[in-house]
């Protein structure tokens, strides 16, 4: 088997746990039923602005980057931090920071941009299933 990776060298990808579908609800009752939410605004891109005093932490961790081919994602948000109060959440994909595209950026470059900026304008979108696909996190 020349040219092929040994089985143990393949990356491990964990899928989210299976969720049983909710009980069937007639279509005319779905509008008001709590198990049927057609509100998609939580998945639309949004802007988050953070100001970081010198020496302070941002209040969140990131994962991913160009090597993972998945983009940069928020892997953890510290409760009661400025990032938490600004609306960042675990599973947010970072689309850009201060007009720098983060969708195809090296992890180290993303960390450098986030750590050196004093005022950060982030464009993010919520993508919850990214949490199960990402490499170990890095505190920023």
From Swiss-Prot:
Q: Which residues form the PDZ domain?
A: 47-129
GO BP, one example?
pore complex assembly
Principal localization? cytoplasm
What does the record give under GO molecular function? protein-macromolecule adaptor activity
Keywords in UniProt for this one? Cytoplasm
Q: Key word Chloroplast present in the record?
A: no
**Any Gene Ontology CC annotation:** cytosol
Compartment annotation: Cytoplasm
CDD domains according to UniProt: PDZ_PDZD11-like
Under PANTHER family, the record lists:
PROTEIN LIN-7 HOMOLOG
Instruction: Identify this protein by name.
Output: PDZ domain-containing protein 11
**Protein's organism:** Gallus gallus (Chicken)
Q: What is the lineage of its organism?
A: Eukaryota, Metazoa, Chordata, Craniata, Vertebrata
Gene that this polypeptide is encoded by: PDZD11
């Amino acid at each position: 088997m020349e040219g092929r990776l040994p089985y143990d060298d393949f990356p491990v990808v964990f899928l989210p746990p299976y969720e049983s579908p909710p009980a069937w609800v007639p279509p005319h009752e779905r509008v008001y039923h709590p198990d049927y939410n057609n509100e998609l605004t939580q998945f639309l891109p949004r802007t988050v602005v953070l100001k970081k005093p010198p020496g302070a932490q941002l209040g969140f961790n990131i994962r991913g980057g160009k090597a993972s081919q998945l983009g940069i994602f928020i892997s953890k948000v510290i409760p009661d931090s400025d990032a938490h109060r600004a609306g960042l959440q675990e599973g947010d994909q970072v689309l850009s920071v201060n007009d720098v595209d983060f969708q195809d950026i090296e992890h180290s470059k993303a960390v450098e941009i986030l750590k050196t900026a004093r005022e950060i304008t982030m464009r993010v979108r919520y993508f919850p299933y990214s949490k199960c696909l990402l490499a170990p996190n890095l505190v920023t």
